[in-house]
């Protein structure tokens, strides 16, 4: 059981490449794409933070407080290293983590986790059923557009559960994805330029007095 989980963790964020083994060109293309994404991470992070500061508010042509880029303080960013839950509980931390996962081509994990959080809050049986099917088609079924890396047994159990959807349909899968992120993506995030930049305190420079 433990070795199976280790293998799952090792494969977190690694896309299922059907052309695996086709050589350097595939790897070179992936590395080039990754470098491009990493190069503009600040722009993407700014977008996430700006939008997370004004949820549900439409953009207008006028400048407003909601449209101002708000960067979390270094002290707030440092709190995210205390626990994975601290990161997820912060809207800025969550936005930064999503931007980081996007640069690593594995944002489907956090998107699935967030979809499950929303799903568990759903009260209407009709909405519960429709959301369950959407989560299944988006993340669970074979070759889903955002397919997550979970075992066949869990997938089969979910396929049965969504026939009569309850708030616990995706509990097992959500816990496994959470564990994958906590043990793999989260440590890499804390070591990344993404995070280190946010933790830096601005340097105060003083101009020399005129003589």
Swiss-Prot record:
Disruption phenotype: Mutant mice display increased blood pressure and impaired relaxation of vascular smooth muscle. SUPFAM superfamilies: Regulator of G-protein signaling, RGS. Expressed in a wide variety of tissues. GO terms for molecular function: adenylate cyclase inhibitor activity; beta-tubulin binding; G-protein alpha-subunit binding; GTPase activator activity. Residues 79-116 are annotated as: Necessary to inhibit protein synthesis. It comes from the Eukaryota. The keyword Cell membrane applies. Keywords: Cell cycle, Cell membrane, Cytoplasm, GTPase activation, Membrane, Nucleus, Phosphoprotein, Signal transduction inhibitor, Translation regulation. Residues 32-66 are annotated as: Necessary for membrane association. One of its GO terms (biological process) is response to ethanol. Coiled coil: none annotated. Gene3D superfamilies: 1.10.196.10, Regulator of G-protein Signalling 4, domain 2. GO terms for cellular component: cytoplasm; cytoplasmic side of plasma membrane; cytosol; nucleolus; nucleus; plasma membrane. Phosphorylated by protein kinase C. Phosphorylation by PRKG1 leads to activation of RGS2 activity. Residues 83-199 form the RGS domain. It is found in: Cell membrane; Cytoplasm; Nucleus, Nucleolus. The keyword Transport does not apply. Interacts with GNAQ. Does not interact with GNAI1 and GNAI3. Interacts with EIF2B5. Interacts with PRKG1 (isoform alpha). Regulates G protein-coupled receptor signaling cascades. Inhibits signal transduction by increasing the GTPase activity of G protein alpha subunits, thereby driving them into their inactive GDP-bound form. It is involved in the negative regulation of the angiotensin-activated signaling pathway. Plays a role in the regulation of blood pressure in response to signaling via G protein-coupled receptors and GNAQ. Plays a role in regulating the constriction and relaxation of vascular smooth muscle. Binds EIF2B5 and blocks its activity, thereby inhibiting the translation of mRNA into protein. This is Regulator of G-protein signaling 2. It comes from Mus musculus. The gene is Rgs2.
